[in-house]
């Protein structure tokens, strides 16, 4: 831990997201985790959220990452295109689902998009149908509590 009054907020050896349960994507392809790290209550008792940053370079294999799931906290998902001349151009086609069973809805996204998934609402899978340019996928878990 870093020294000083605020050293407890500087986590120099954070967890890797791929080391967490249900996050081993070693057999998957089409994306990379650029320095993806995870801070939780074990490392910083005051940390109440997490942040995932993933560059999508190609269609993911398997295509449904992650599958349909829910959690007891809200999540924000950002899909950001990498066209410097048109930031609203996603550079591909992404399929996103919310709800399950008869309430399930699917959305086809081709522009930079922000998504809010309320606590408990089933969502996913996130399917990258086409990737023409890298797509930045950011997920933020809000007020996650003890969830891992």
Positions of PLM-derived features:
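A short, N-terminal "cap"/entry segment at the start of jelly-roll beta-barrel domains
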Residues: 1-67
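Residues at beta-strand starts and edge strands
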Residues: 49, 74, 90-92, 133-136
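Short basic alpha-helical hairpin corresponding to helix-turn-helix/winged-helix-like nucleic-acid-binding
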Residues: 58-65, 69-81, 92-94
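Short acidic (Asp/Glu) patches
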Residues: 59-63, 98-102, 119-122
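A short beta-strand-loop-beta hairpin characteristic of the jelly-roll/cupin
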Residues: 79-110
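Conserved metal-binding segment of the jelly-roll/cupin
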Residues: 106-128
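A short hydrophobic beta-strand segment most commonly corresponding to one strand
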Residues: 116, 130-148
